[in-house]
Amino acid sequence: MAGHSKWANIQHKKARQDAKRGKIFTRLIKEITVAARMGGGDPGANPRLRLALEKAAENNMPKDNVQRAIDKGTGNLEGVEYIELRYEGYGIGGAALMVDCLTDNKTRTVADVRHAFTKNGGNLGTDGCVAFNFVHQGYLVFEPGVDEDALMEAALEAGAEDVVTNDDGSIEVITAPNDWAGVKSALEAAGYKSVDGDVTMRAQNETELSGDDAVKMQKLIDALEDLDDVQDVYTSAVLNLD
């Protein structure tokens, strides 16, 4: 199965993540706390917590910080009670956006999200207005040059749902959300280390944007991601920023 070119977008995403690394710990602490509250403190029995801990390890979060977040979630330590919110809307060229938040103040959050949309050429929609276009799945991306047949065999044996070769030669392994961490670990044990990966809401129909439209869309995404209550921003936009 063939896919679009992902390589440039991955590199661009990594550059933006590095620039925002100061906020990553705060978001991870929130996610670990909520994951532990919802599913318990054992990552072996809690896929959401296991994913959050994988991200914490990748970002070199101190173990004491991680344990405190788990303890706050399980009630062993006092902590803030966060609620989960999802907002949907439209960006440049009608591109779909989904914005996941963890907050202790819903009124503040919706006002901030609406302002970011409005100020940057988008508009906040109603619940369900774009959700139909997204599917919840995990993915792992491997550099061009990896033995596709061997990787496919290892991935499918590990429980992956699909393996996609992108136009630029990179290879993408698709998983069910709860299987992502297990597939990643199995492939690493077999000698395959991914260069990107996550559990995401992926658009089934994409919107290609280039030139000024791509720049404006990136500005909208950045404005949303910069909000303290925002955890993740998903979009149908494919940005050609070169």
From Swiss-Prot:
GO terms for molecular function: DNA binding. GO terms for cellular component: cytosol. Its main location: cytoplasm. It comes from the Bacteria. Disulfide bonds: none annotated. GO terms for biological process: regulation of DNA-templated transcription. It is found in: Cytoplasm. Keywords: Cytoplasm, DNA-binding, Transcription, Transcription regulation. Belongs to the TACO1 family. This is Probable transcriptional regulatory protein NMC1563. It comes from Neisseria meningitidis serogroup C / serotype 2a (strain ATCC 700532 / DSM 15464 / FAM18). The lineage of its organism: Bacteria, Pseudomonadati, Pseudomonadota, Betaproteobacteria, Neisseriales.
